[in-house]
Amino acid sequence: MKTLSPVDAVLKKVRAFNAEHGMFRPGDRVVVAVSGGADSVALVDILVSLNELRLDLVVAHLNHKLRGAASDEDERFVEQCAQTYALPFVSRGEQVKALAEWERLSLEDAGRRARYAFFDDVAAACGARTVALAHHADDQAETLLMRLVRGAGGLGLSAMQPVGAGGKYVRPLLALGRQEIEAYLDARGLAFRQDQSNTDVAFLRNRIRHELVPYLGRLNPGAASRLARTAELLADDEALLSRLVEEALRRHVMVTEQGGAICSVDTLRREPRGLRRRLYRKAIALAKGDLARISFDHVDAIDRLVLSENPSGRLHLPEEILVTRSYNEVAFARRMADIPSLQELWIDGPGCWPLSGGGELVVEIATGPPPWGELSTTESWFDLELAPFPWLIRGWRPGDRMIPLGMTGEKKVKDIFIDQKVPRELRRSIPLLFRGDSLLWVCGCRRGESARITAGSRAMAVVRIRGRRLK
């Protein structure tokens, strides 16, 4: 069998990898992320060489402004590279160090954020469907090790995907190792830039690349490729688990109008811990928009809250995300200002009475007996001879009591709230209806014995509350 040249061997692998993962379609416009280093220079040349795809390439370079004149020389080199292939060139300068300080990020994380924002902008501006990145199999092994050292679950350890972000970001060189890329560059006679920061072992990735990976290579010469294969296997498992999580999400999680999520505690407790943790992360993402700054400790704290015998509790997560346990519900939402206490309102007769904080109280004179079997918790009837106007609407105060309908003894309103599972943060906003010192109705919870309708009642009022959350 004829041995393929380094160039032909690389092109054959990339073609097969593209066929397997569907990264490119003939005629696609593709933004190529080019730093000027060996891998990205090889990427441009490889994509140009895939003649059968007729790709419409745009070279994009972000100047990180971290290495002074050397950063500017990198930019000029990439521009000349684009000119060599007669490709459009787009660049932008970004003060990554200032961004890192402002956002309290590491230089690595700030640089990554700036690059992806830039690539997104370029793709949108030129109408590109795809952004091609130059990560290869050795990068994959390094990423897996880095995340393993920092601590990660299955999703993190599956590392980089050949096709990510819904098909937007593709990594055609994951099929290749560093040595194959270097042999390709040498065979093609391609020059590239050397970034001295890549040798700085102050960065974790560089320590892994220059110290840990060579050590593992001495233990097993194929360690890097096997680590990359492990990441691929984990990614396959993760795809299956993600499908199971999505199915559980539809069954167990209710998405709120405000963009948060509510889950049943009893339902969560019946699920395996691994699935619970994934559901928590999904619920946080619904409320927050992403999972940035969410750690294992946060997710573990939520699980303890769900499993606790205490029926209520709350957790404050980064970026104003609040997780609240209230009896059999756990809610994930962006924290809002505390709900204010209800302002006092005097009711002197029938009409629509707006309530502070939203909603209204509707008072009507009744002409017939109550439809006892059809009354909702937002409606109550009163004997006007026993409780004539004016009435007072106000919020709950510690010490408030009432005689509930059908009982002879008093009960604390706080205990009524607990029985009805009213969240603690809502209690001071629940309307209480008084006639003098007598509490007639804890709206949405319990009616009082005072002024109840009897067979002998002649003058009656029906009161309804509308447009207000009561539980």
From Swiss-Prot:
Keywords attached to this entry: ATP-binding, Cytoplasm, Ligase, Nucleotide-binding, tRNA processing
Source superkingdom: Bacteria
SUPFAM superfamilies, per database record: Adenine nucleotide alpha hydrolases-like (SSF52402), MesJ substrate recognition domain-like (SSF82829), PheT/TilS domain (SSF56037)
Principal cellular location given in the protein's record: cytoplasm
One Pfam family recorded for the sequence: TilS_C
Catalytic activity: cytidine(34) in tRNA(Ile2) + L-lysine + ATP = lysidine(34) in tRNA(Ile2) + AMP + diphosphate + H(+)
Function: Ligates lysine onto the cytidine present at position 34 of the AUA codon-specific tRNA(Ile) that contains the anticodon CAU, in an ATP-dependent manner. Cytidine is converted to lysidine, thus changing the amino acid specificity of the tRNA from methionine to isoleucine.
Protein name (record): tRNA(Ile)-lysidine synthase
Gene responsible for this protein: tilS
